[in-house]
């Protein structure tokens, strides 16, 4: 059998090793100059005014919700077809996640679904830019402005995603992820961009114990060695080791995403003759980052179930992923919201499968996946 082809693999090279070595030799390995450089670079990428690096996108979501004073009695609208960390953060703050359905073919939350879920208790809206494609964020933001509700963009899949000529996160507030499978990675990490100066100031405090400054800031600017606690906060800062890797990856972003697009195109061309259904692309102008390549496996159409397909691919040495099992079908949320019904989400959650997609894949690797799909489709 050929070597196992994983669903994802980080694209690391000598540049990342050199970046880590530089930090280790500098004597400053925790939050410091590399964090500042990463934040500046993301402001340049997105065009937004403020960037706050954090230890994970989940941490970023937590402190953003906290900074907006979301808590008991509040409601936050979000799709169920998302990673559960968003729902968990809402719930842990005592608020109620209001899960809405997605478009059946793009798997993107729609402005109409969001607006229909708004109540007097709605405090925030969290749309997801899914799989590397952008949600219709202008329309969603217009709803937020009309009702006076904060919009927090889940941009975990959207490093390199453009919407109507602007990078995701160009304005408003958006949260990116640098997890190991993301388009750029530093193993674990995240970053918030915002055009709200007061929110940015509060996020910087909340990510580091509620202090007004961090240790590097105190040393650099000669401030008092013991900072003042201004509000209770967390330990969500990113180390310079991680930030240095992320910076190096960011410099390669165009190359990394170009390779993802090439593989996605190879899949698209092959799937035109197969019964497996890829996602539809959004109708609005955009640049897709191709974080994921997802097919839907309808047993009646394909002659095989999704789970059986994933197992058969595994037997052929090919890894796959599932993004995502609907959050409202998870045990905790199923018991909390037993009557919830989201037909498009549920239909897709039972059929979606993420194919291998990462920059170091070769054309032969993609051909191997395609050949396996052809065989499993009886061709």
UniProtKB/Swiss-Prot annotation:
Lineage: Bacteria, Pseudomonadati, Pseudomonadota, Gammaproteobacteria, Enterobacterales
Pfam family, one: DegT_DnrJ_EryC1
Keywords: Aminotransferase, Antibiotic resistance, Lipid A biosynthesis, Lipid biosynthesis, Lipid metabolism, Lipopolysaccharide biosynthesis, Pyridoxal phosphate, Transferase
Family: Belongs to the DegT/DnrJ/EryC1 family. ArnB subfamily.
Residues bearing PTM N6-(pyridoxal phosphate)lysine: 182
One GO CC term, this protein: membrane
InterPro entries noted in UniProt: ArnB_NH2Trfase, DegT/StrS_aminotransferase, PyrdxlP-dep_Trfase, PyrdxlP-dep_Trfase_major, PyrdxlP-dep_Trfase_small
Matching HAMAP family: ArnB_transfer
Task performed by this protein: Catalyzes the conversion of UDP-4-keto-arabinose (UDP-Ara4O) to UDP-4-amino-4-deoxy-L-arabinose (UDP-L-Ara4N). The modified arabinose is attached to lipid A and is required for resistance to polymyxin and cationic antimicrobial peptides.
GO biological process assignments: lipid A biosynthetic process; lipopolysaccharide biosynthetic process; response to antibiotic
Entry protein name: UDP-4-amino-4-deoxy-L-arabinose--oxoglutarate aminotransferase
Complex formation: Homodimer.
Cofactor(s) the record lists: pyridoxal 5'-phosphate
SUPFAM superfamilies referenced in this protein's UniProt entry, alphabetically: PLP-dependent transferases
Metabolic or biological pathway: Nucleotide-sugar biosynthesis; UDP-4-deoxy-4-formamido-beta-L-arabinose biosynthesis; UDP-4-deoxy-4-formamido-beta-L-arabinose from UDP-alpha-D-glucuronate: step 2/3; Bacterial outer membrane biogenesis; lipopolysaccharide biosynthesis
This enzyme's EC code(s): 2.6.1.87
MF terms (GO), sorted A to Z: pyridoxal phosphate binding; UDP-4-amino-4-deoxy-L-arabinose aminotransferase
Catalyzed reactions per annotation: UDP-4-amino-4-deoxy-beta-L-arabinose + 2-oxoglutarate = UDP-beta-L-threo-pentopyranos-4-ulose + L-glutamate
């Amino acid at each position: 059998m050929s070597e196992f082809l994983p669903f994802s693999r980080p694209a690391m090279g000598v540049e990342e090793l050199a970046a880590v070595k530089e930090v280790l030799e500098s004597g400053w390995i925790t939050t410091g100059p590399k964090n500042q450089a990463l934040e500046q670079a993301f402001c340049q990428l997105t065009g937004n005014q403020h960037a706050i690096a954090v230890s994970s996108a989940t941490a970023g979501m937590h402190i953003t919700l906290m900074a907006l004073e979301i808590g008991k009695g509040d409601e936050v609208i979000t799709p169920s077809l998302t990673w559960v960390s968003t729902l968990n953060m809402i719930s842990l703050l005592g608020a109620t996640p209001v899960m809405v359905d997605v478009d059946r073919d793009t798997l993107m939350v729609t402005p109409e679904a969001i607006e229909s879920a708004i109540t007097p208790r709605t405090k925030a809206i969290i749309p997801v830019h899914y799989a590397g494609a952008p949600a219709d964020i202008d329309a969603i933001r217009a709803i937020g402005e009309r009702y006076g509700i904060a919009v927090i963009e889940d941009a975990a899949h959207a490093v390199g995603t453009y919407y109507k000529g602007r990078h995701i996160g160009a304005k408003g507030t958006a949260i990116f992820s640098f997890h190991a499978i993301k388009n750029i990675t530093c193993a674990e990490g995240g970053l918030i961009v915002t055009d709200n100066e007061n929110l940015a100031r509060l996020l910087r405090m909340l990510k580091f114990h509620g202090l007004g400054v961090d240790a590097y800031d105190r040393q650099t600017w000669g401030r008092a060695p013991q900072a003042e606690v201004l509000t209770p906060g967390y330990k969500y800062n990113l180390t310079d080791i991680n930030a240095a890797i992320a910076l190096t990856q960011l410099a390669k972003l165009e190359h990394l995403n170009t390779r993802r697009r090439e593989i996605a195109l190879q899949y698209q061309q092959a799937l035109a003759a197969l019964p497996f259904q890829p996602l539809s692309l959004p109708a609005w102008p955009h640049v897709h980052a191709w974080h994921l390549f997802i097919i839907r496996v309808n047993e009646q159409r394909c002659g095989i179930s999704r789970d059986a397909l994933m197992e058969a691919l595994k037997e052929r040495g090919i890894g796959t992923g599932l993004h995502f099992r609907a959050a409202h079908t998870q045990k905790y949320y199923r018991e909390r919201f037993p009557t919830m019904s989201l037909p498009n989400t549920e239909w897709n959650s039972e059929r979606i499968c993420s194919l291998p997609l990462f920059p170091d894949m070769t054309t032969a690797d993609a051909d191997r996946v395609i050949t396996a799909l052809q065989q499993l489709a009886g061709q």
